[in-house]
Amino acid sequence: MIFAPTPPTPPDVPALGDTVTLAVNGVNGAPSSSIVVLLAITLLSVAPALLLMTTSFTKIFVVLSFTRNALGLQGVPPNQVLAGLALFLSLFIMAPVIGDVNELGVQPYLAGDATFTEAVDVGKGPLQAFMLEHTREEDLALLTRAAGLENPEDPSAVPFGTLVPAFLLSELRSAFIMGFVIFVPFLVIDLVVSASLMSMGMMMLPPVMIALPFKLLLFVLVDGWGLVVTALVGSYTGAG
């Protein structure tokens, strides 16, 4: 007996009017573990950019770099040390904001009480309020005009994409002002040492080498690192 082969069955193709639904939630409406892992990896990949653009890290790192240059030290402390100090100072300053973001956005999403879009919209509120508090109105107006938008009556209505560069401009301006204040006393030491060497006829001796110990001594005597860190933290908390 010969049996004819059964013809293959084509897969079901959704009709033109049918809708395809993709579910990303797990049990009881909570996000599945794979989605949580994917979001965690995504956040880790964009964390450096978020750290640089939306927190106090940029200002702190620039001021610490100005301090090192004012002392005349080229590679001490190294950039890794300055970046580490700036990172933990940023975490210290941003701790209340991070706590609010976690409470308002992250935890409701993990509990399944909010969608991802709702969690992002609510969670970015504390971060947006922090940036608005430390952004000059002039920088907001500048970026708003550059984007071709009308100046909003309420600063909180500024789009997030416009607020971030305005915040960075304000942070850089504040960092440069602090850098100028840090440079002045060390510049005076350089001038005094140079004038003293010229008056003694020691023009071949590099003034930078002679001035460096006096700069370090002055910086240690006045507790320079403590003053710089206190000024940086106080510029955000209003203390000091």
Residue positions per predicted region:
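Hydrophobic alpha-helical segments and their helix-loop boundaries in membrane
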Residues: 2-240
